[in-house]
From Swiss-Prot:
The active site is at 61 (phosphoserine intermediate). It catalyses: (2R)-2-phosphoglycerate = (2R)-3-phosphoglycerate. It comes from Francisella tularensis subsp. tularensis (strain WY96-3418). Mn(2+) 1 binds at residues 399, 403, 459. This is 2,3-bisphosphoglycerate-independent phosphoglycerate mutase. Mn(2+) 2 binds at residues 11, 61, 440-441. It comes from the Bacteria. Its cofactor is Mn(2+). Belongs to the BPG-independent phosphoglycerate mutase family. It is an enzyme of class 5 (isomerase). InterPro entries: Alkaline_phosphatase_core_sf, BPG-indep_PGM_N, Metalloenzyme, PGAM_B_sf, Pgm_bpd_ind. Catalyzes the interconversion of 2-phosphoglycerate and 3-phosphoglycerate.
Length: 512
């Protein structure tokens, strides 16, 4: 019977001493409080340069899981693209040039789709603005921007500033206009809610939408009048001079998001010949280009293809003939699999995966426990089975409920997680295993912005906890650690040599 080493990632569980709308600190968490007092712990960095992001940029789930799983600081797409723009090589990118050449050759249209936001989590609006400028420089005559609106990694009603910037740039360059707007709730689903994606797709491709207005700003104002914040703006088309824009054969579409998980579904709708999740009028003959690789199965050009890291935690465990399990509910399943493995889709030998469906609710404040009960049941059963050397799991609650801005619901989510942690603690200690508890970034630790007194729905840059729960004697060996130090710590407790590619350091020393 194997002694399991369990890594619990509490998504969005940051640490803050402030009790100002801090759902984590103010919730009733007897198990967490006792673990915090009784077991070795420290705080580690999950944002900024320490996870390969620009200075002061908040971390996110993709970045967090990549850094944890790879055991080294992995420089993120945001940083790479910023560097290409700074060095003026962005416009020389082969995939981008091919998309633009296709438009010029066919005298067709260039469509940019993506999250128009300064959030820096899934995209950055500066990348969109740079692409618009490059298109003008290279001779594009007609460019249409299909803007997905944020309100999740940014304040809920903050899109006006971004829309005005885009409008002004397009007008100054006499290049085109914003042809549709849509909340990310529709265009960037990742939970197989294809009815949402269908509405976004039809607005972009077929100019078929519930609402049509004369400008993107008017569309936003009318959405607010219906009490729909940025994230939930119903897909809307913009009519200019009596003209509605459609995507047609021989057009080029460039998807400007750099993060994969919420870009996959709508990309498949654009590119899959045998797509069957909702009816399309036809399969378009277009040049479809993505800024980064969203899914290796997508038939499209990729501007910044990934470099597969070697000797990630999963690969090292496989090479040492260890069994491993990855488990999460739908919202975070790609993070403990694809992202944790450094962008690898395939399972390693000896790696099992369990996907628990996320509840089908409009927003997760309606069901703060999400699918944590089912995740915990499977985890406890896996620990009791003695089958696995290493288990990696993710609890989505503190992030997904935190994103709703509902403080009371976030506290309920935290309190439910506390009960789940109690069950895991009992199972691990009973079987003489090791449990590490951490987070990939903060969120529920600040539910209201103290400066604006408005709901704070974005991630925080706060440090995150790293706790060891087990019978071994452990001492903190590394102050000011970071997410990339977690994998070396797990290898240390399991008695496995750390490969040279892992540049992280062990956070705890354990008595032999």
């Amino acid at each position: 019977m194997k002694k399991t080493t369990l890594l619990v990632i509490l998504d969005g569980w940051g640490y803050s001493d402030s009790d100002y709308f801090n759902a984590i600190k103010n919730a009733n968490t007897p198990t967490w409080d006792s673990i915090w007092q009784e077991f070795p712990k420290t705080l580690i960095n999950a944002s900024s340069l320490e996870v390969g992001l620009p200075r002061s940029q908040m971390g996110n789930s993709e970045v967090g899981h990549v850094n944890i799983g790879c055991g080294r600081v992995v420089y993120q797409e945001l940083t790479k693209i910023d560097k290409a723009i700074e060095e003026k090589t962005f416009g020389d990118n082969k995939a981008i040039c091919a998309a633009i050449d296709n438009v010029i050759k066919n005298d067709s249209n260039l469509h940019l789709i993506g999250l128009l936001s300064p959030g820096g989590v899934h995209s950055h609006e500066e990348h969109i603005f740079e692409m618009i400028k490059i298109a003008k420089q290279k001779g594009i005559k007609r460019l249409y921007l299909h803007a997905f609106l944020d309100g999740r990694d940014t304040p809920p009603r903050s899109a006006e500033k971004s829309i005005k910037k885009a409008d002004k740039l397009l007008q100054d360059l006499n290049l085109g206009y914003i042809a549709s707007v849509c909340g990310r709730y529709y265009a960037m689903d990742r939970d197989n809610r294809w009815d949402r994606v269908e509405k976004a797709y039809n607005a972009i491709v077929n100019a078929n939408a519930d609402f049509i207005y004369d400008s993107a700003l008017e569309a936003l104002e009318q959405s607010y009048a219906r009490d729909q914040s940025d994230e939930f703006v119903i897909p809307t088309c913009i009519k200019k001079d009596g003209h509605l824009v459609k995507v047609q054969d021989n057009d080029s579409v460039i998807f400007m998001n750099f993060r994969a998980d919420r870009a996959r579904e709508i990309s498949h709708a654009f590119t899959d010949e045998s797509f069957d999740h909702f009816p399309r009028k036809k399969h378009l003959n277009i040049n479809f280009t993505t800024l980064t690789e969203y899914d290796s199965k997508l038939k499209c050009a990729v501007a910044f293809p990934p470099k597969q890291p070697i000797n990630t935690l999963g690969e090292v465990l496989m090479k040492n003939h260890k069994t491993q399990l990855r488990i999460a509910e739908t919202e975070k399943y790609p993070h403990v699999t694809f992202f944790f493995n450094g962008g690898r889709e395939e399972q390693f030998e000896g790696e099992d995966r369990i996907l628990i469906p996320s509840p089908k609710v409009a927003t997760y404040d309606l069901q703060p426990e999400m699918s944590a009960p089912e995740v915990t049941d499977k985890l406890v059963a896996a620990i009791n089975s003695g089958k696995y050397d290493c288990i990696v799991c993710n609890y989505a609650n503190s992030d997904m409920v935190g994103h709703t801005g509902n403080y009371e619901a976030a506290m309920q989510a935290i309190e439910y997680l506390d009960k789940c942690i109690a069950r895991l603690k009992d199972a691990i200690l009973e079987h003489d295993g090791n449990m590490f508890i951490t987070a990939d970034h903060g969120n529920a630790d600040m539910m209201v912005n103290p400066e604006t007194q408005k709901p704070h729905t974005a991630h925080t840059t706060n440090l995150v906890p790293f706790i060891y729960v087990g019978h071994k004697k452990a001492q903190v060996a590394l102050e000011h650690g970071k997410l990339s130090d977690i994998a070396p710590t797990l290898l240390n407790v399991m008695g496995i040599a750390q490969p040279k590619e892992m540049t992280g350091k062990t956070i705890f020393n354990f008595e032999k």
